[in-house]
């Protein structure tokens, strides 16, 4: 029921490659704008982890410092099968936790420690820097061509398959809550299932636009989003040369909805596509609205910035920066089959 094989913008890559042979093949580092204050109620830790989920690290840390998990916050979840650095915050007003700077456990260790006047939360990140190793690359020239292509044109901004849980398990749970009325007390899990449902519907709309080669074009009635911002406006023209130029300059992008209570912004051709996709999912839409979710917008185009690559005898090391909330795997799937 939940096929995650979304259509590609540039067709199926000629090249195959091996990915994630070991955690070091997928390295992620969080990026922030600005600096931590160095003072305040929250201890802020830079943690390196390998082979663990963010939740597993938080539980381990909580046990070691004898704190409830609810006092520990994060800005973003990081993959298990990866070598990642990320920041966590602990609400500890006026408290010194002895030895925390050198704390470590199997699979993770603390690299830096400071304080801040605010707790970390989703939305705090400006982005993530990825370093990815692809092994046994079968067609280096096709890979290089595709890298150069996405530098300028970007890729469809799908949510990655990890958003939906193993074998789409988060979507199954979402169906149980939204359609069958199942109760889930855990707010974190409930939020995760709702996020998966909204992401699924967003991906369906974006995949339709990719199939029709309109994912990166401004349709009549489209919501347009400023790149790197939540600011939006509605395109009221069928073909706007100035808007096309701004898209080419990476200034704006057509956007698709994350469903919830609608403000009825989208119009015309864009609305027709959305309504056709939504027609099969009315129970989900009703459930999301009843649970208080508000409609939001996500850019159709994802730009990978600061792209660099090195090739050595069939092994390619690729690095780039993505904005917070974007998935490296949706970039990779446009480059190679893995």
Curated annotation (Swiss-Prot):
Which HAMAP family does the record cross-reference, listed alphabetically? Answer: TruD (MF_01082)
Q: What is this protein called?
A: tRNA pseudouridine synthase D
Q: Which residues form the TRUD domain?
A: 154-303
One annotated GO molecular function: tRNA pseudouridine(13) synthase activity
Q: Does the keyword Chaperone apply?
A: no
Q: Name one GO biological process term.
A: tRNA pseudouridine synthesis
Q: Give the family per the record.
A: Belongs to the pseudouridine synthase TruD family.
Under the heading Pfam families, the entry gives:
TruD
Keyword entries, A-Z: Isomerase, tRNA processing
Purpose: Responsible for synthesis of pseudouridine from uracil-13 in transfer RNAs.
What InterPro entries does the entry give?
PsdUridine_synth_cat_dom_sf, PsdUridine_synth_TruD, PsdUridine_synth_TruD_CS, PsdUridine_synth_TruD_insert, TruD_catalytic, TruD_insert_sf, TruD_pseudoU_synthase
